[in-house]
Regions:
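Divalent cation-coordinating acidic motifs and surrounding scaffolds
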Residues: 1-255
Length: 255
């Protein structure tokens, strides 16, 4: 209940009721629906407009049971027209495989990317189509580990770096395929990249996803200097004041 209350307050008072919210580390659809209900209840109690969020989530592959999902505002803007019309929700590449050096395989995407295609409606009758891809990529845990690896990997760190790179390439290829399919499609990639916006030396997965990789010899991951996205994606964090360009505080350090 405390978490629901805090998240509801953040959505209402800090985020100001966004039209679409991408969420990560959600237990299941029921939990997301509970959050949507709590936001509505709190909004009404505080004399705020009820956003009538609809929840969308598809179960993924994570052993801990966490998934990515969306809250979409369906409050009416005119007549019976909702603020956002959801056209499709698709889980991408849930069965894609990660190949180890010994030729054994495992699922690449523990939390597969979730694509939502929607139309935002305005009171005056105008509409705007948008495609969102909600991501939660492999963490940085053990990225520099030197402990002996398995399945043909020399170290555990080598495996982590390779998996992070392959996830970045998979997402970049997804974005590029959609750009090639329709140059006019507005694509927004959001979520938890578990990556810095700069090259950290281990790898630069964020740059790979955006289409601005660093030269191969500047990271510990072989073969990551290939540009897979054209035109490049824009890092919207750069539109914020410098002091606000962080999404997490780790041991007192904003990052």
């Amino acid at each position: 209940a405390t978490r629901l209350a805090k998240t509801s307050k953040a959505v209402r008072e800090n985020l100001k009721f966004p039209d679409i919210i991408g969420l990560q580390e959600v237990e299941n659809l029921g939990a997301l629906q509970s959050l949507a209900t709590r936001i509505s209840t709190d909004a009404i109690a505080n004399a705020q407009p009820d956003p009538l969020y609809a929840a969308y989530l598809v179960e993924g592959n994570d052993v801990g049971g966490i998934d990515v999902g969306y809250l979409v505002k369906t409050a009416v803007v005119s007549g019976v027209t909702p603020r956002v019309t959801v056209n499709s929700v698709v889980q991408e590449d849930a069965g894609e495989l990660f190949v180890n050096p010994d030729a054994s395989t495992e699922l690449l995407n523990d939390r597969p990317n979730l694509r939502l295609m929607a139309t935002v409606n305005f009171a005056g009758g105008q509409t705007s189509a948008i495609t969102l891809v909600n991501v939660h990529l492999r963490s940085l845990n053990s990225v520099g580990a030197t402990t002996p690896g398995s399945n043909g990997w020399l170290t555990d760190g080598e495996r982590v770096r390779a998996k992070r790179q392959k996830q970045a390439e998979s997402l970049a290829n997804l974005v590029q395929a959609r750009q090639v399919g329709s140059a006019a499609e507005r694509i927004l990639v959001l979520g938890d990249y578990n990556a810095f916006e700069v090259n950290d030396g281990f790898g630069h997965s964020f740059g790979v996803i955006r289409g601005v990789p660093v030269p191969d010899n500047e990271t510990a991951v072989p073969g990551d200097g290939v540009d897979l996205v054209n035109p490049d994606l824009t890092d919207l964090a750069t539109t914020l004041p410098v002091a606000q360009r962080y999404s997490y505080t780790f041991d007192g350090n904003a990052q």
